[in-house]
Amino acid sequence: MAGQPSHMPHGGSPNHLCHALGPAPPPDPQRLPNTLSFRCSLADFQIEKKIGRGQFSEVYKATCLLDRKTVALKKVQIFEMMDAKARQDCVKEIGLLKQLNHPNIIKYLDSFIEDNELNIVLELADAGDLSQMIKYFKKQKRLIPERTVWKYFVQLCSAVEHMHSRRVMHRDIKPANVFITATGIVKLGDLGLGRFFSSETTAAHSLVGTPYYMSPERIHENGYNFKSDIWSLGCLLYEMAALQSPFYGDKMNLFSLCQKIEQCDYPPLPGEHYSEKLRELVSMCIYPDPDHRPDIVYVHQVARQMHVWTSST
């Protein structure tokens, strides 16, 4: 990725949560290079409760004893899931993510290796997420009002534009990674690290975590790029309107899913409920050829215009 630092920023940075903890011990060739030893340690946190888990990770609500801030502490089984180069790339990526500073992005505060685990300290998103909101409306048999769709989508676009302007791809945009605070502020989480420890964004060998947001270029293993994030934004916008993924289907195997994605075969959104502009933006983002998808600047511009228009009507 362009612009990646060759090492992690030092602990004196104002963005870091904790102070330096002393010099690093000599590196063990069997372990991840101990570039993070001057950061926090687990002793600096009072862990309160588990708030999430993934295949290789667990997330806890915790209090940093150094400044009494409530944070999220993500513990990743980094040595069980990847080789040495992937671990080094993962640590570099975290260094890049810490440079992001945006009100709609969950802040990466610190990271350190301890007990053979990668510990990532994050701003706590102590709220619901977009997938829960979609499920709520589906259960109520109600569509999400278009004004509400744009209210949240414009904030998400602002977050993604900030990331792309700094040459950072998200790689895992989906409703479950879009948190919404009690005051209606969007917080985009799980940034950039999906390729390291998320099985849900790759073509899994089973239907567990079926990748409904996987773009055609991922199917053809052509690599992820910034336009792949745009595809995911289009899928998310569609799902907010239709209350299900564009490529969702009952009893569908991975082969038929990939066929639907390659052909952009999805049901049209109801024209009587949603504007032509929304439906047009979805079709532009969910387009087979990534070179013909709009960039995030355009998507954000449309979202801003529609947010203003729907808020005033």
From Swiss-Prot:
Residues 1-44 are annotated as: Interaction with ARHGAP33, ANKRA2, CDC42, PRDX3, RAD26L, RBBP6, RPS7 and TRIP4. Binding to NEK9 stimulates its activity by releasing the autoinhibitory function of Tyr-108. The record marks 108 as: Autoinhibitory. One of its GO terms (molecular function) is protein serine kinase activity. It comes from the Eukaryota. SMART domains: S_TKc. GO terms for cellular component: centriolar satellite; cytoplasm; cytosol; nuclear speck; protein-containing complex; spindle pole. It is found in: Cytoplasm; Nucleus; Nucleus speckle; Cytoplasm, Cytoskeleton, Microtubule organizing center, Centrosome. Belongs to the protein kinase superfamily. NEK Ser/Thr protein kinase family. NIMA subfamily. Interacts with NEK9, predominantly in mitosis. Interacts with KIF11 (via C-terminus). Interacts with APBB1 (via WW domain). Interacts with ANKRA2, ATF4, ARHGAP33, CDC42, CIR1, PRAM1, PTN, PRDX3, PIN1, RAD26L, RBBP6, RPS7, RPS6KB1 and TRIP4. Interacts with STAT3. Protein kinase which plays an important role in mitotic cell cycle progression. Required for chromosome segregation at metaphase-anaphase transition, robust mitotic spindle formation and cytokinesis. Phosphorylates ATF4, CIR1, PTN, RAD26L, RBBP6, RPS7, TRIP4, RPS6KB1 and histones H1 and H3. Phosphorylates KIF11 to promote mitotic spindle formation. Involved in G2/M phase cell cycle arrest induced by DNA damage. Inhibition of activity results in apoptosis. May contribute to tumorigenesis by suppressing p53/TP53-induced cancer cell senescence. Phosphorylates STAT3. This is Serine/threonine-protein kinase Nek6.
